[in-house]
Amino acid sequence: MGGMAAQIPVKNNDEENDKAFEKVRNDKEREVNNGHDGTWVAHPGLVPVAMEIFDNQLSGDNQLDVSLDNVTITQDDLLEVHKGQRTEEGMRECIKVGVQYIEAWLAGRGAVPLYNLMEDAATAEISRAQIWQWLKHATKLDDGRTVNEELFKDILTSEIDNLKNVLGDDVWAKGKYEKAVEIFEKMSISQVCEEFLTLPAYEEIVSS
């Protein structure tokens, strides 16, 4: 079974919609060529794309005959830490996705469309855990600044202001955004990394 394509159809923007479908097509072609027997997508509108690709290649019930003998993966490969850059843009992305997902989760929605992707709790968990880790280890950003609580709170405030402007005061007030910000901030700066983001969020639900 292949992985899930998180892309969703983009309304009122043909160019972005074409990009989303192309990403899904490339992803599913890679999977079927690697020997997967099936796959899944985040949105029913993308099922025909995935079905077409797999139906065209699969001639039987499975692809057990397909092997990747030309690929060698070692223990060192599995343990190698990614060496990508750490950026302010990355922090902002974590904040705006994490806060909006928590807000939706508190309102009873588990799968949330954000920035043309269907997100779930795992995305929000990665977002807050990454910021927690950067704070814990005083990570350096690519511009030389150290990630500390002051920097995090400054960027958090900036992103929340941006989000309020986009959503509008009425939507913000009617939603659970203030509580979502509170949960995200508290979990990010905590001395102990919570086991999973939804645990303290669930406590908020049962206590309200």
Regions inferred by a protein language model and the residue ranges of each:
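Expand to "…catalyze enediolate/carbanion chemistry for C-C bond making/breaking, isomerization
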Residues: 1-208
